[in-house]
């Protein structure tokens, strides 16, 4: 159970962090 919850937690974190990084990179390129 711990491995499954940690896997989903990591997946959720990746899905939330990746768009934030892409948005920050796009803002840097616009400037």
From Swiss-Prot:
<keyword id="KW-0472">Membrane</keyword>
<keyword id="KW-0602">Photosynthesis</keyword>
<dbReference type="GO" id="GO:0009535">
    <property type="term" value="C:chloroplast thylakoid membrane"/>
</dbReference>
<dbReference type="InterPro" id="IPR007802">
    <property type="entry name" value="Cyt_b6/f_cplx_su6"/>
</dbReference>
<keyword id="KW-1133">Transmembrane helix</keyword>
<dbReference type="Pfam" id="PF05115">
    <property type="entry name" value="PetL"/>
</dbReference>
<keyword id="KW-0934">Plastid</keyword>
<dbReference type="GO" id="GO:0045158">
    <property type="term" value="F:electron transporter, transferring electrons within cytochrome b6/f complex of photosystem II activity"/>
</dbReference>
<keyword id="KW-0249">Electron transport</keyword>
<comment type="function">
    <text>Component of the cytochrome b6-f complex, which mediates electron transfer between photosystem II (PSII) and photosystem I (PSI), cyclic electron flow around PSI, and state transitions. PetL is important for photoautotrophic growth as well as for electron transfer efficiency and stability of the cytochrome b6-f complex.</text>
</comment>
<dbReference type="GO" id="GO:0009512">
    <property type="term" value="C:cytochrome b6f complex"/>
</dbReference>
<keyword id="KW-0812">Transmembrane</keyword>
<feature type="transmembrane region" description="Helical">
    <location>
        <begin position="4"/>
        <end position="26"/>
    </location>
</feature>
<protein>
    <recommendedName>
        <fullName>Cytochrome b6-f complex subunit 6</fullName>
    </recommendedName>
</protein>
<comment type="subunit">
    <text>The 4 large subunits of the cytochrome b6-f complex are cytochrome b6, subunit IV (17 kDa polypeptide, PetD), cytochrome f and the Rieske protein, while the 4 small subunits are PetG, PetL, PetM and PetN. The complex functions as a dimer.</text>
</comment>
<comment type="similarity">
    <text>Belongs to the PetL family.</text>
</comment>
<keyword id="KW-0813">Transport</keyword>
<dbReference type="GO" id="GO:0015979">
    <property type="term" value="P:photosynthesis"/>
</dbReference>
<keyword id="KW-0150">Chloroplast</keyword>
<keyword id="KW-0793">Thylakoid</keyword>
């Amino acid at each position: 159970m711990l491995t499954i919850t940690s896997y989903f937690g990591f997946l959720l974190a990746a899905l939330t962090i990746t768009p934030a990084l892409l948005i920050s990179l796009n803002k840097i390129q616009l400037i």
